[in-house]
Amino acid sequence: MSQLFPGRYTVNVSEPFVIFLIGMRVNQFWAMKKWWSVSSAMGPMLKVLKENPEKGMLGAESFFRVWPLETCMVTYWRSFDDLIRFARSSDDPHLKPWQDFMKNIGGDGSVGIWHETYRVNPGDYESIYGNMPAFGLGKAFEPVPISEKTRKATERMGAIAQK
């Protein structure tokens, strides 16, 4: 079990960062070969990113729904440029699975894929965690205890920008 941080904590991030959400949805369960190829492509990508922090991914959390069969991964990146560089590089394990998806699945409707990208500036976010292990932003960045100045969401939002 991961180490719990007792009490309440937040994160203070002084540099811009990127939140990238990515997921897939099985639309035709019987098309297992197609959706399995999509879902199994994520493991090698995460392995490379974990072993090579210079590529810019700072952390990730995964979520899964049984029906309809869906996945969602929330990832935190140092910059949008790092994310795009990884996605487009033929030396990294994203480009080939993307090309395979477009060739073998494309618009046939068997598997849905999606992503959303958000650039976040210091002070344009807030977070709180209570009696949790490092999670989300609290895993991607250093967790700090809640103080009198960061007790409320309205105090945390914009706290970095005001410094």
Residue ranges and their predicted role:
Residues 1-65, 70, 82-85, 109-163:
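Short S/T/G/P-rich N-terminal loop/turn motif that feeds into the first structured element of a domain
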Residues 76-78:
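Tryptophan-centric aromatic hotspots in well-structured domains and transmembrane helices
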Residues 80-113:
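An amphipathic, aromatic/His-enriched active-site/gating alpha helix that lines ligand/cofactor pockets
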